[in-house]
């Protein structure tokens, strides 16, 4: 049996870090939404063997236990004593190490797909609980749509989708270590976004307020260390984006744009100096088990 599943990227419309917890994780409060930039995950059952095989044409995708999709398959096999293998083919469209949860989305898609392939009968809530053991963003990626994420990111409260608009993304040719960004974050010196106000703006579909309220506390670290990220932000604003923000720990920057003509201007302007530029829409729907 063979299954093909989309694994969409996410952006953070608002990201706040509240404090460092005794368990070493950071308590966060953030609004995330999925966008129409997605990897493709293909699962092929291997009933005659017990292996997990990762295949990808992208040389930056690990084919062993470092891969979150591999970890998702291994977790299901061990939890439910599955005695058959699976080949996981990953076609990458989401940039790697970009702050867009590409690896987490691959893991979430693998959980959803293997739930069907192996006929486990798990609910999305049960899959999200398993996903949280793999990574903080995996639980959100199991559900998709738009949500308020709290705890270390694994406590998911769905909220309505934002009003439709274009999302233009640009990633500079650098990688950013999420762990290093958190290590260098000085919470007493940063400006904290109003996440609750963002939720209310989304609930009343107030595009102008959403644009005013975007905020990411991690910018305080990444923009200082990587001036190319700050440069992309400046250029995106100059070209006319309605709101501009770094996603996650970076380095990808996104702009929200309401009108087609302005989106084209921003997209074309960024293509002049940045190789990885995308123009996509937000995804309104949460994932289903069908």
Curated annotation (Swiss-Prot):
| Active site per UniProt | 10, 137
Keywords of this protein's UniProt record, alphabetized?
A: ATP-binding, Isoprene biosynthesis, Kinase, Nucleotide-binding, Transferase
Q: Which Pfam families match?
A: GHMP_kinases_C (PF08544), GHMP_kinases_N (PF00288)
Q: List GO molecular-function terms, semicolon-separated.
A: 4-(cytidine 5'-diphospho)-2-C-methyl-D-erythritol kinase activity; ATP binding
EC numbers, comma separated = 2.7.1.148
Q: Pathway it acts in?
A: Isoprenoid biosynthesis; isopentenyl diphosphate biosynthesis via DXP pathway; isopentenyl diphosphate from 1-deoxy-D-xylulose 5-phosphate: step 3/6
One GO biological process this protein is involved in is: isopentenyl diphosphate biosynthetic process, methylerythritol 4-phosphate pathway
Q: Which SUPFAM superfamilies match?
A: GHMP Kinase, C-terminal domain, Ribosomal protein S5 domain 2-like
InterPro entries xref list: GHMP_kinase_C_dom, GHMP_kinase_C_sf, GHMP_kinase_N_dom, IspE, Ribosomal_Su5_D2-typ_SF, Ribsml_uS5_D2-typ_fold_subgr
User: Under what name is this protein listed?
Assistant: 4-diphosphocytidyl-2-C-methyl-D-erythritol kinase
List the top taxonomic levels of the source: Bacteria, Bacillati, Bacillota, Bacilli, Bacillales
């Amino acid at each position: 049996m063979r299954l093909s599943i989309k694994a969409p990227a996410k952006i953070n419309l608002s990201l706040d870090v509240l404090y460092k917890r005794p368990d070493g994780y950071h308590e966060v409060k953030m609004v995330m939404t999925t966008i129409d930039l997605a990897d493709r995950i293909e699962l092929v059952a291997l009933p005659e063997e017990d292996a997990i095989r990762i295949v990808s044409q992208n040389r930056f995708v690990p084919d062993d236990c470092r891969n979150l999709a591999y970890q998702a398959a291994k977790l299901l096999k061990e939890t439910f004593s599955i005695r058959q293998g699976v080949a996981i083919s990953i076609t990458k469209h989401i940039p790697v190490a970009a702050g867009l949860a590409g690896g987490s989305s691959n893991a979430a898609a693998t959980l959803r797909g293997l739930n069907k392939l192996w006929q486990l009968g798990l609910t999305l809530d049960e899959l999200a609980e398993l996903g949280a053991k793999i990574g903080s963003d995996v639980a959100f990626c199991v559900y998709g749509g738009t949500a308020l994420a709290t705890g270390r990111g694994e406590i998911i409260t769905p909220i309505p989708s934002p009003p439709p608009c274009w999302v233009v993304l640009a990633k500079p040719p650098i990688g950013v270590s999420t762990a290093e960004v958190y290590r260098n974050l000085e919470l007493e010196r940063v400006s904290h976004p109003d996440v609750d106000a963002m939720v209310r703006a989304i609930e009343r579909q107030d595009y102008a307020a959403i644009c005013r309220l975007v905020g990411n506390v991690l910018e305080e670290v990444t923009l200082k260390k990587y001036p190319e990220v700050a440069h992309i932000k400046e250029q995106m604003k100059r070209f006319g984006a309605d709101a501009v923000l770094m996603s996650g720990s970076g380095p990808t920057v996104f702009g929200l744009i309401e009108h087609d003509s302005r989106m084209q201007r921003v997209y074309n302007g960024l293509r002049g100096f940045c190789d990885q530029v995308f123009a996509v829409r937000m995804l309104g729907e949460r994932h289903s088990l069908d």
